[in-house]
A protein has these predicted regions:
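Class I SAM-dependent methyltransferase Rossmann-like catalytic core
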Residues: 7-26
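Conserved alpha-helix/loop element of class I SAM-dependent methyltransferases that forms part
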Residues: 23-41
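A short acidic, Gly/Pro-enriched loop at the edge of an enzyme's catalytic core
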Residues: 38, 101-112
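Class I SAM-dependent methyltransferase SAM/SAH-binding core
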Residues: 44, 50-102
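A short SAM/SAH-binding and catalytic strip from SAM-dependent methyltransferases
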Residues: 110-123
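A short glycine-rich, Lys/Arg-flanked "PGG" loop and its adjoining helix->strand segment in the class I
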Residues: 125-137
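Conserved beta-strand signature within the Rossmann-like core of class I S-adenosyl-L-methionine
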Residues: 138-145
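Core SAM-dependent methyltransferase catalytic element
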Residues: 165, 174-186
Length: 186
């Protein structure tokens, strides 16, 4: 019997925790993203929050690349814009506020990030179908969920939903205190 799916949204008022020094130390975004991102690529950061992965991704893809940052909370995107501007990478980041947990734009991405967000989305079938539609045939979706919020059983259920919607597991990536999977189109 499936577990009840939690979908509480992380409060923007606590966003400092999402980009703080301790998280950068334990979940270094450059170390996580570098094996997947090259200059000129397009990345979709679904549930970008204040830009913990978005800003490093923008540096890795360079000025010839494009980053789409999608979040349900405009306050998170406002923080992301300030952070990206401070780091000098705002020029290749497009922010999209969509309170309906949708992407809201047609695009094709080399890499899609869904980091600490799937458990917040009420309709994960719709989520994975939408993400698959925007993933290039040779692209990868990096999925991570926090161990303190998502049990191993719940994460396996999430992977089954992804599989049902045309994505298969192609591996894992290392991220402290997280359950992870690298997904590709099946």
């Amino acid at each position: 019997m499936p577990h009840e799916h939690k979908h509480d949204i992380f409060c923007a008022g606590r966003a400092g925790k999402l980009i703080g020094f301790l998280r950068r130390l334990t979940q270094n975004p450059y170390r996580i993203l570098k094996p997947y991102l090259k200059e000129g690529m397009t990345l979709l950061d679904f549930g970008s929050g204040p830009g913990f992965f978005t800003v490093p991704a923008a540096k890795l893809v360079g000025t010839s690349g494009k980053i789409y940052a999608v979040d349900v909370q405009q306050q998170m995107l406002d923080m992301l814009v300030k952070y990206a501007d401070k780091k000098g990478v705002l020029g290749n980041i497009i922010t999209i506020n969509n309170p309906e947990h949708e992407i809201g734009i047609e695009l094709e991405a080399d890499i899609i990030l869904a980091i600490y967000v799937a458990h917040e989305v009420p309709d994960r079938d719709k989520l994975f179908l939408s993400l698959k539609k925007r993933l290039k045939p040779e692209g990868f979706l990096l999925l991570a969920e926090p161990k303190h919020r998502v049990t191993e059983t719940e994460f396996k259920e999430t992977l089954e939903i992804a599989k049902k919607n045309g994505l298969e597991e192609a591996g894992k990536f290392k991220m402290v205190e997280s359950r992870t999977a690298v997904l590709k189109k099946s």
